[in-house]
Amino acid sequence: MQKEKVWDKLSTDTEERMNAANELFSDRKVVPSQNGVALLEAVIRAGDRINLEGNNQKQADFLAECLGSCDSEKINNLHMVQSAVPLPIHLDIFDKGIAKKLDFAYGGPMAAKVAEFLREGKLELGAIHTYLELFARYFMDLTPRVSLICAYEGDKDGNLYTGFNTEDTPVIAEATKFRQGIVIAQVNKLVDKVQRVDIPGEWVDAVIESPKPFYLEPLFTRDPANITDTQVLMGMMALKGIYGEYGVQRLNHGIGFFTAAIELLLPTYGNELGLKGKICKHFALNPHPTMIPAIEDGWVESIHSFGGELGMQKYCEARPDIFFIGPDGSMRSNRAYSQTAGHYATDMFIGGTLQIDKYGNSSTATASRVAGFGGAPNMGCDAKGRRHVTDSWLKCGAEFEDQAALLGDMPRGKRLVVQMQETFKEKMDPSFVEKLDAWNLAKNANLDLAPVMIYSDDLTHIVTEEGIAYLAKCRGLEERMAAIRGVAGYTEVGLSADPKETKTLRERGIVKTPEDLGIDRSRANRSMLAAKSVKDLVDCSGGLYEPPARFVNW
């Protein structure tokens, strides 16, 4: 007689694991913090796929410490799937043998350490993803068996308030719980009733009030005092030669001083150019403090945020016409939704990088740093499924002559994808190279694919201190390479430029210098910025912006 097939192995296994942890609970779903390590040892098995909530900003740091304190004889060979690995403890668990494999999106401060662990064989890399790509795999082949998340508030029934820094939590919890997994949350505070139910209690198996609030990284805060004159010049070129030229109204700004400079130029140079009301209306963007002057000056209509930003909560709550504010009066971020908006609803992505090769491929992965990509590849690409029309999208598509080779006379738009980078970085390290370091990283980490952030066929513009290369206007790869050489300065790539060829490209408007754009280099200095310090941002916000202590020097 044929044995009856069992269809509920996952839920049965989950029940067995939770039963093993029964004695650790104090009240309904509450587990005392001193039982944190024991709880993880009860519900996690060697070889499990684990999500440890490491976001851009908020970190489930207490649960990370608990995981790092587990007995590696019991808990080992874990496959970690998480957005970011910005804390030392995230790699300590690999050093201790508790974890073996990593699939992630962003390395941040641990970028150099990730590269070191790869070289030493302490860490096996699955892939470097973009955020939305990793989230998608949570619902396919990388579903966590146990997820360790964090929230501001939780109650005895497991309801969570994630609020300003909701970030990745909903997608993690849903993917895990609806595949019969286990969800454990650390909360800053246990309350009788949460301020707002962001994660329903049915999705949460255990709640731990952590000894201290979860760590928040002010990742997108840039001190205007550190913006250089060169960055101001490049910002002026971008505003006049790209934003104004294409009338970009829906966009995303990547992290860094280049885009911070642009944000602070809107109320000054942007107004001088008469661009208010014509550009920069709708953003998929974290609440950058450097956006405050532009918001106050009436440039922005809406901002949906991937995450919060430390110190910006009161300001966002006081501007409900701009930010997405709930009935309780607090903002809710959501990385999955904002990444979706960034992919389909924006007309431009603009941000920095670490290396660009002679073809225009761009990467933040170098021989010594595995920085990851975050959301850049998701927004820094042409969304082929897009079907709605905007003027800037159509204009860029009309310029993209190579598209006709595959589509014939069928019109289609194209997203503007802009990389801003000075020709040399710190220590005179060239930004333009013949071959990306990503190739060596792929070899050292046994990756099938070199980790490229933005591929050349998606890249439409490069901005350096030398000028702008309008790559979408180029006819074929050779002309694109010539345009790149024309703005690559004194790098090896730039020195191979043919002056006559560059001159022809300038005449055709494919390469534009500041002079071609009518920009006076002598005006490109910090005096053009709407705020020149963090104190200026605080004053502009009417005291609503409360910067982290590291940025307070007055």
From Swiss-Prot:
Any GO molecular function: transferase activity
Predominant location: cytoplasm
Superkingdom as given in the UniProt entry: Bacteria
Broadest EC class assigned to this enzyme: transferase
Activity sensitivity to pH: Optimum pH is 5.5.
Pfam families xref list: Mal_decarbox_Al
Biological function: Alpha subunit of the biotin-independent and biotin-dependent malonate decarboxylase multienzyme complex (EC 4.1.1.88 and EC 7.2.4.4, respectively). Acts as an acyl-carrier protein (ACP) transferase component. This first step in malonate decarboxylation involves the exchange of an acetyl thioester residue bound to the activated ACP subunit for a malonyl thioester residue. Has a weak activity with acetyl-CoA as substrate.
Protein name: Acetyl-S-ACP:malonate ACP transferase
Annotated organism of origin: Malonomonas rubra
